[in-house]
């Protein structure tokens, strides 16, 4: 009577059983399905967009671009990060489920680039806001360099241990928006002294005509370099009128003099 055992049992069993740990299985599943959140603020994002085409085909690495941070575990910062965009970047990173990773793409993201010398609104390094796992220099980096950065990130994910990942999550690795406010001293509210607001102006001692009379009291004509500011409306209305200033002996006609600025 023949045996009921399969003749191929001894040949297929060693090749169909894999001995592994739960940690390695989790790492393998995560590195094979990295879902990136595209955070492009400048020209570096154009190079990443070229990966979607058939020439590079980044789908072979399991990358599926997502528009929501709650469905992504990888954020790629491509371009300049300004002070105004920094809170939104931190907020997006906080909304991503852990474990999460960051790739800093381009010189402007890593160090601020050409804007880091004299710009008051550029963040000089995105690692001051969120933790960075892979730095990708270039201005801009080529698509082949982006693929190399993804491969390096996959190797990092494959070597991770659950205990180490838990310790990193407990520590303060990045800037957070969960500030703790404290009660400070009372500030100056701007209640000015009413006496200063309603203070009447000091009366003028002499009028303009009196000043002119004293100035040209001893002369019979006005100097040629005497000028007048003529950009006001009153000058346009009264340019054809005659102005007289009474002196001690005669009247001086101001119309014959050319008024210029």
UniProtKB/Swiss-Prot annotation:
Cofactor: bound how, per the entry note? Binds 1 [4Fe-4S] cluster.
**Superkingdom of origin organism:** Eukaryota
Reactions this protein catalyses: a plastoquinone + NADH + (n+1) H(+)(in) = a plastoquinol + NAD(+) + n H(+)(out); a plastoquinone + NADPH + (n+1) H(+)(in) = a plastoquinol + NADP(+) + n H(+)(out)
Family matches, as Gene3D superfamilies: 3.40.50.12280
State the family it belongs to: Belongs to the complex I 20 kDa subunit family.
Tell me the function of this protein: NDH shuttles electrons from NAD(P)H:plastoquinone, via FMN and iron-sulfur (Fe-S) centers, to quinones in the photosynthetic chain and possibly in a chloroplast respiratory chain. The immediate electron acceptor for the enzyme in this species is believed to be plastoquinone. Couples the redox reaction to proton translocation, and thus conserves the redox energy in a proton gradient.
* PANTHER family, sorted: NADH DEHYDROGENASE, NADH DEHYDROGENASE [UBIQUINONE] IRON-SULFUR PROTEIN 7, MITOCHONDRIAL
User: What is a single cellular component term in the Gene Ontology annotation?
Assistant: respiratory chain complex I
Any one Gene Ontology MF annotation carried by this entry is:
quinone binding
Q: Which UniProt keywords apply?
A: 4Fe-4S, Chloroplast, Iron, Iron-sulfur, Membrane, Metal-binding, NAD, NADP, Plastid, Plastoquinone, Quinone, Thylakoid, Translocase, Transport
In its UniProt entry, what is this protein called? NAD(P)H-quinone oxidoreductase subunit K, chloroplastic
State its cofactor.
Answer: [4Fe-4S] cluster
Q: What assembly does the database describe for this protein?
A: NDH is composed of at least 16 different subunits, 5 of which are encoded in the nucleus.
According to its UniProt record, where is this protein located?
Plastid, Chloroplast thylakoid membrane
**Residues annotated to bind [4Fe-4S] cluster:** 43-44, 108, 139
PROSITE patterns membership: COMPLEX1_20K
Biological-process GO terms, alphabetical? aerobic respiration; electron transport coupled proton transport; photosynthesis, light reaction
SUPFAM superfamilies for this protein: HydA/Nqo6-like
From the UniProt annotation, give the residues forming the signal peptide: none
Membrane topology classification = Peripheral membrane protein
Tell me if Transcription is a UniProt keyword of this record. no
Q: What is its EC number?
A: 7.1.1.-
């Amino acid at each position: 009577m023949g045996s009921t055992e399969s003749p191929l049992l001894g040949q297929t069993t060693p090749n169909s059983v894999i001995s592994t740990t739960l940690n390695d299985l989790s790492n393998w599943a995560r590195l094979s399905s990295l879902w990136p959140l595209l955070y492009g603020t400048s020209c570096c994002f154009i190079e990443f967009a070229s990966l979607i085409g058939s020439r590079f085909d980044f789908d072979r690495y399991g990358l599926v671009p997502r528009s929501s941070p709650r469905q992504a575990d990888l954020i790629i910062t491509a371009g300049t990060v300004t002070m105004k965009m920094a809170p939104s970047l931190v907020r997006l990173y906080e909304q991503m489920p852990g474990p999460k990773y960051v790739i800093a793409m381009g010189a402007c993201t890593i160090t601020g680039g050409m804007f880091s010398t004299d710009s008051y609104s550029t963040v000089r390094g995105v690692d001051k806001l969120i933790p960075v796992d892979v730095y990708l220099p270039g201005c801009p980096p080529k698509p082949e360099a982006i693929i190399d950065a993804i491969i390096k990130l996959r190797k990092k994910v494959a070597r991770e241990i659950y205990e180490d990942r838990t310790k990193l999550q407990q520590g303060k690795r990045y800037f957070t928006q969960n500030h703790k406010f404290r009660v400070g001293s009372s500030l100056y509210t701007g209640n000015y002294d009413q006496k200063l607001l309603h203070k009447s102006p000091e009366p003028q001692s002499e009028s303009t005509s009196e000043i002119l009379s004293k100035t040209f009291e001893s002369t019979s004509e006005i100097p040629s370099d005497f000028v007048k500011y003529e950009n006001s409306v009153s000058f346009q209305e009264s340019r054809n009128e005659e102005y007289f200033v009474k002196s001690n002996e005669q009247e001086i006609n101001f119309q014959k003099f050319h008024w210029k600025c």
